[in-house]
Amino acid sequence: MLYSCLASKTTFHFAAGLCSGLTSSILLQPADLLKTRVQQSQKTASLLPTIKTILSSPHPIRGLWRGTLPSALRTGFGSALYFTSLNALRQGLAQTEAAMAIAASSSDGKSRTSSSALPKLSNWGNLATGAVARTAAGFVMMPVTVLKVRYESDYYAYRSLYSAGRDIVRTEGVRGLFSGFGATAARDAPYAGLYVLFYEQLKRRLALVASSEQSEQPLKSTSSSSINFVSGGLAAGLATAITNPFDAVKTRLQLMPGKYGNMIRAVRLMIREDGVRSLFGGLGLRITRKALSSALAWTVYEELILRAEARWAEKDKIDL
């Protein structure tokens, strides 16, 4: 019975993560495509000319959503794996005596003066679980990420994802499907860790403000959703600004692995050829996309989990 319950909850976290990831990736694909194009080369690609080029093409709408399938697969299943592993890590860490002792001063259990149904951890716990979960999910989804970047870019003339994958394996071997993983991990681990840290801190502070305004009454569902959305957007903006250089390097490595080789060589070449500015290429687009996608994904995920937790609690009462 316990195993069945845990399995169903794990499955639901996977489904909730998948749903939230698909929603954000499909809606915000144009911003992701523009970011990839802008990061190709700081000298030849800037935002306005890139937009004009796409809009002047025979199929502008299709052009803006080019690469939606690999992006949706990557973000959808990546989010599913990330949220599932993040929940497992947070649940496990929250149950240890050391974590409980560290988090005791800020933990309030499942109180609805919080906007979240997720376990409360210390700052280091939030940082570590976010980084580990994102790195693991990123490794599993790396081949899809490489396909997405190559397909979105105008460096290649791939007509389908199959032809892209076949060409990469033929010319670069299976290793080519993991191009840029070092830079991706260097970007995603600190980004995810910082994001979860900022997100939880912002939620806690905003929830305290909202609960005081509601005279100690439980938070309304609309208040919880608003708190999660605002916290997600702000946390993503902060974490994105800090880690953008890794994203710019990752894009170059995935587009031209033969030229750039590794992270250190890529950084040197980018600065030599395009200046320090190249490390911050696409920052505005990435902040916009990350803020919106994270706000949407985490709000949808948290809302689904809150509703599921309420139903599971009611079911447990009935079973008793």
Swiss-Prot record:
Catalytic activity: glycine(in) = glycine(out)
GO molecular function: glycine transmembrane transporter activity
Keywords for this protein: Membrane, Mitochondrion, Mitochondrion inner membrane, Repeat, Transmembrane, Transmembrane helix, Transport
Matches recorded under InterPro entries: Hem25/SLC25A38 (IPR030847), Mitochondrial_sb/sol_carrier (IPR018108), Mt_carrier_dom_sf (IPR023395)
Annotated GO biological process: glycine import into mitochondrion; heme biosynthetic process
Compartment(s) of residence: Mitochondrion inner membrane
Pfam families documented for this protein: Mito_carr
Signal sequence region: none
TM stretches of this protein: 14-39, 67-93, 127-152, 180-203, 227-253, 282-300
Family annotation (SUPFAM superfamilies): Mitochondrial carrier (SSF103506)
Cellular component, GO annotation: mitochondrial inner membrane; mitochondrion
Topology of this chain in the membrane: Multi-pass membrane protein
Solcar repeats: 8-92, 121-205, 223-307
PANTHER family recorded: MITOCHONDRIAL GLYCINE TRANSPORTER
Protein family membership: Belongs to the mitochondrial carrier (TC 2.A.29) family. SLC25A38 subfamily.
Function: Mitochondrial glycine transporter that imports glycine into the mitochondrial matrix. Plays an important role in providing glycine for the first enzymatic step in heme biosynthesis, the condensation of glycine with succinyl-CoA to produce 5-aminolevulinate (ALA) in the mitochondrial matrix.
Protein's name according to its UniProt entry: Mitochondrial glycine transporter
Source organism: Aspergillus fumigatus (strain ATCC MYA-4609 / CBS 101355 / FGSC A1100 / Af293) (Neosartorya fumigata)
Lineage: Eukaryota, Fungi, Dikarya, Ascomycota, Pezizomycotina
